[in-house]
Amino acid sequence: MQPEGAEKGKSFKQRLVLKSSLAKETLSEFLGTFILIVLGCGCVAQAILSRGRFGGVITINVGFSMAVAMAIYVAGGVSGGHINPAVSLAMCLFGRMKWFKLPFYVGAQFLGAFVGAATVFGIYYDGLMSFAGGKLLIVGENATAHIFATYPAPYLSLANAFADQVVATMILLIIVFAIFDSRNLGAPRGLEPIAIGLLIIVIASSLGLNSGCAMNPARDLSPRLFTALAGWGFEVFRAGNNFWWIPVVGPLVGAVIGGLIYVLVIEIHHPEPDSVFKTEQSEDKPEKYELSVIM
C-alpha cells in the first residue's frame, strides 16, 4: 500500500495528463517551434551582437540547422515535429495528416515562434540596447531586425525573391519526403532529424545569399511581428519593398510543389510491398513516427 502522499502525487500527475491527442500534438508543435526560434535566432543574435567575434555565416547556418534537428527530436514522437506551416500544409494535401488538425498545428507554430522571438529579445536585451546606442534599427551596419526575420539583399527583386523561396522550400520537401520514405533508402530510425539538419545546412549554404532562406512562414512572420511590437516599428513590414509576404507565401507554394514532385516522380512508382514486409514495417516503426502521419 502506497503512502498517502504518493497517492496524492499520483492523482496530481494524472490531472496534468492531457487526454486529447490533438491537444498533445498542438503543445508539441508549440514547444518544438519555440526551441527552433530560441536556438536558431539565438545563433544569429550572438553573431550580430558580437560583430562577428562569436559567430558568422557558418555558425548561423550550422546552428540554425541543428536547432531544427533538436526541435524535431523534441516534438517528433508526438506531433511529428513539423515546426513549419508549409510542411503541415503539404502533409494535409498529400494525405499524411487530417485537415482538421491544420489550424491547430499552424496556430501553435506561429505562437511558438512569437514566444521564441520574445525569449531571444529578453536574453539579449542589454546587448541589443548597447549595440546601436539604444536604437533598434532595420537597415544599416547597426541593424538588428535581421536577427529575428529575413530581409532581402539590396539587388533582389520581389519576383526573384519569390522564386528563391519557392525553389528552396520545394527542395526541402522533396528530400524530407525521401528521408521518411521507408521504400526508398530513407534514414535510420532516430537519425531522421539529423538528416534534416544536414539538409538545411546544404540549402542554407547554397541558396541563402538572396534573403536568408527562411522556408518557414512561422519562423519569419511571427518574429517579424514581434520586432514590430518590440520597438523596431511596422517598417519591418515595409522594408525591402514590402518583402514580408515572400517568406510566408513562397514556402507554402514551394512545399506543395515539392511534395507533388516527389509523389509523381518517385513515390507512386514504388512496387507494392508484400504482406510480410508490411508486417515488419508496422512492428519496427510505430505508426506515430511514419511519414504518413507526421511529416
Swiss-Prot record:
Question: Where found, per UniProt?
Answer: Cell membrane; Basolateral cell membrane
- GO MF terms on file? channel activity; glycerol channel activity; hydrogen peroxide channel activity; purine nucleobase transmembrane transporter activity; pyrimidine nucleobase transmembrane transporter activity; urea channel activity; urea transmembrane transporter activity; water channel activity
Q: Which residues lie on this side of the membrane: Cytoplasmic?
A: 1-24, 78-79, 93-98, 179-190, 265-295
Question: Where does this chain carry the motif NPA 2?
Answer: 216-218
Its signal peptide is none
Q: How does it sit in the membrane?
A: Multi-pass membrane protein
**Which intramembrane segments does UniProt give?**
80-92, 211-225
Cellular-component GO terms for this entry:
basolateral plasma membrane; intracellular membrane-bounded organelle; plasma membrane
Q: Where are the transmembrane segments?
A: 25-43, 58-77, 99-123, 161-178, 191-207, 244-264
Q: Which Gene3D superfamilies match?
A: Glycerol uptake facilitator protein
Name any Gene Ontology BP term: water transport
Annotated family? Belongs to the MIP/aquaporin (TC 1.A.8) family.
Protein role? Aquaglyceroporins form homotetrameric transmembrane channels, with each monomer independently mediating glycerol and water transport across the plasma membrane along their osmotic gradient. AQP9 is the primary route for glycerol uptake in hepatocytes, supporting hepatic gluconeogenesis. It exhibits broad specificity and may transport various small, non-charged solutes, including carbamides, polyols, purines, and pyrimidines. AQP9 may also facilitate hepatic urea extrusion.
Oligomeric state and interaction partners are given as: Homotetramer; each monomer provides an independent glycerol/water pore.
Record's domain comment? Aquaporins contain two tandem repeats each containing three membrane-spanning domains and a pore-forming loop with the signature motif Asn-Pro-Ala (NPA).
Supply the PANTHER family for this chain. Answer: AQUAPORIN OR AQUAGLYCEROPORIN RELATED, AQUAPORIN-9
Task: Supply the name of the protein.
Answer: Aquaporin-9
Source organism: Homo sapiens
Gene name as annotated: AQP9
